[in-house]
Amino acid sequence: MTDLRHYDVIVSPVITEKSTMVSEHNQVVFNVARKATKPEIKAAVEALFGVKVTAVNTAVRKGKVKRFCGLVGRQSDVKKAIVTLAEGQSIDVSTGL
């Protein structure tokens, strides 16, 4: 895997109230590519941030149905990864890469 592939796997960090509360338990939340697997996510986080990952949990958030000027549309589904880091490791997602 090249660095370009790692950047393709991790789309963006998720910065919400719930994800900030989870960060107290050595966990970080990322939006990832829909086709990304748990081993690919683990390898990308370890390569890009230089940390040890102990677990990766994923969830797919289904897109909402939205209306605009009477037309019905649908937002895209988003895959979210909750990455658990080893004890004593941390990632500051607010500064970026």
From Swiss-Prot:
A Gene Ontology molecular function term of the record: structural constituent of ribosome
Keyword rRNA-binding: yes
Top-level taxon: Bacteria
GO CC annotation, single: ribonucleoprotein complex
Matching InterPro entries: Nucleotide-bd_a/b_plait_sf (IPR012677), Ribosomal_uL23-like (IPR013025), Ribosomal_uL23/eL15/eS24_sf (IPR012678)
Xref: Pfam families: Ribosomal_L23
Keyword terms: Ribonucleoprotein, Ribosomal protein, RNA-binding, rRNA-binding
GO biological process, one term: translation
Signal sequence segment: none
rRNA-binding among keywords: yes
Family: Belongs to the universal ribosomal protein uL23 family.
Main function: One of the early assembly proteins it binds 23S rRNA. One of the proteins that surrounds the polypeptide exit tunnel on the outside of the ribosome. Forms the main docking site for trigger factor binding to the ribosome.
Assembly behavior: Part of the 50S ribosomal subunit. Contacts protein L29, and trigger factor when it is bound to the ribosome.
Protein name (record): Large ribosomal subunit protein uL23
Gene: rplW
